[in-house]
């Protein structure tokens, strides 16, 4: 078959820029095994500039071409894009909106589903509307005395809370608060990351993850894996990506079969209900009373050496490169 020009777009310039580059390494290695794709890796920096690995500045135009600042270099026609960008502007749906505007096909969830999942306010509304249990919560829209009083009431009611910036991923702007002394500073800090803040009841629970994705025309939800953190800690940004992280990952969690099946059913319900596409990682809590609570959905999960998504996909029996190729080719034919 004729080779397709595939743009591997990474970085993004946000808080998760460096992690996006690590994930791009994985995608690049997988794509190298697929001869029908001609891959060009381009990084998007914090200034909104595109540049190749050789440092060449370029621009993605509305004619579906990469045009280079060096006008002696011919434009590069783009057939397809993998937006390997965690956080803004990838998982927020912003970059997908541009692709949709210029009719450029791309891998992953569309702009609306990405935005709905990334924003914790809309995500929780969707979880509840779909009838999927999730953690008790309140929303705040600005840092003022009224919000502080609402947060104090939540802390008094629940004993321990998580304060989360509504529009951030990978636990950026996320703080556990166990005492009134921590409250004001944590709330104020969270508002520096997002105009909206979610306050959730702290749940003493196991942290389980499911890879939910499309393969061979069907939606798959793997058996849940597990994140095991040190006592009295949570899976923070540092715990996810630091070399000295104490968190442990288990690809197939030791849970009752009926519980695993229920989690998988919730994952597929969320995938279908929120109209996700190609890939996602859906995170759950499992309490000591075996209550299942949906925590969050990642529409472009990490693909680093320690990331759960590619490991769970492989454990389920799928080859990542073939899974990737199948989705891309099916979309290009449609």
UniProtKB/Swiss-Prot annotation:
Gene3D superfamilies: 3.40.50.20, ATP-grasp fold, A domain, ATP-grasp fold, B domain. It catalyses: 2 D-alanine + ATP = D-alanyl-D-alanine + ADP + phosphate + H(+). Pathway: Cell wall biogenesis; peptidoglycan biosynthesis. Keywords: ATP-binding, Cell shape, Cell wall biogenesis/degradation, Cytoplasm, Ligase, Magnesium, Manganese, Metal-binding, Nucleotide-binding, Peptidoglycan synthesis. The keyword Cell membrane does not apply. Binds 2 magnesium or manganese ions per subunit. Its cofactor is Mg(2+); Mn(2+). Residues 124-329 form the ATP-grasp domain. This is D-alanine--D-alanine ligase. It comes from Shewanella pealeana (strain ATCC 700345 / ANG-SQ1). The gene is ddl.
